[in-house]
Amino acid sequence: MRIPLLAPDNYAFPDPAYALARCDGLVGVSRDLDAGRLLEAYRNGVFPWFSRDGWFFWYAVGPRAVIVPERLHVPRSLAKTLRNGSYRVAVNGCFAEVVAHCAAAARPNQDGTWIAPEFQTAYLKLHEMGHAHSFECHYPDENGKTRLAGGFYGVQIGRVFYGESMFALQPDASKIAFACAVPFLADLGVELIDCQQDTEHMRRFGSELLPFADFAERLRMLNAVPLKEEIGRREVACKGL
């Protein structure tokens, strides 16, 4: 199989439909992980999955797992935790720390992490540009001091939020962050959350599958529409629970 080589001076991607037709989803490889290439990738439903020997591998997945914010489902046990817990949720309070924890988190059936230092640097750049955001769940420790317990990060372009990775140092901490983040993002105008892959974890929150062509069309429409207001850095209240 011939793997498409992405030109260093051109951020355009081949049509992901060809990669999906081959069943492997590999859209191309590049030597760079520039912010401009990352943004162009997300706009086209493509994301970087891992690196090897200095090459970055870009993939598309279809059908695509997404969450429509108004159809978010919060499992009953998690809703109880949300009502009774002493947690605090914030956005963009400690982005670099969240990414570092996601990189260090153990994953089933994975040897190591795909979030290598080059990826962390790239997402930090997107964060500085206002496109990458973290949601953090904090819990008080035994001394009553609030500490980071879990969270996740992703990329926002227009009215789409592209989820990337989660971690939890305490049970349900990343789930709490996600359950609070979705209504918050919806209030700001986000209309679609990209989960990338179809997992049981996201199905519990009400994820659904879109044919890739439909997903790509939604991206074309929603990426061009700005949010009602910037995500910023603030506390996040859990609503409707």
Swiss-Prot record:
Organism per entry: Neisseria gonorrhoeae (strain ATCC 700825 / FA 1090)
Name assigned to this protein: Leucyl/phenylalanyl-tRNA--protein transferase
HAMAP family linked to this entry: Leu_Phe_trans (MF_00688)
Class of the enzyme per the UniProt entry, highest EC level: transferase
EC assignment: 2.3.2.6
Molecular-function GO terms, alphabetical: leucyl-tRNA--protein transferase activity
One cellular component term from this protein's GO annotations in UniProt: cytoplasm
Cystine crosslinks: none
Function: Functions in the N-end rule pathway of protein degradation where it conjugates Leu, Phe and, less efficiently, Met from aminoacyl-tRNAs to the N-termini of proteins containing an N-terminal arginine or lysine.
Keywords, in A-Z order: Acyltransferase, Cytoplasm, Transferase
Main location: cytoplasm
Annotated Pfam families: Leu_Phe_trans
Tagged with keyword Acyltransferase: yes
Compartments where found: Cytoplasm
Encoding gene, per UniProt annotation: aat
InterPro entries reported for this sequence: Acyl_CoA_acyltransferase, Leu/Phe-tRNA_Trfase, Leu/Phe-tRNA_Trfase_C, Leu/Phe-tRNA_Trfase_N
GO annotation terms (biological process): protein catabolic process
Cell cycle among keywords: no
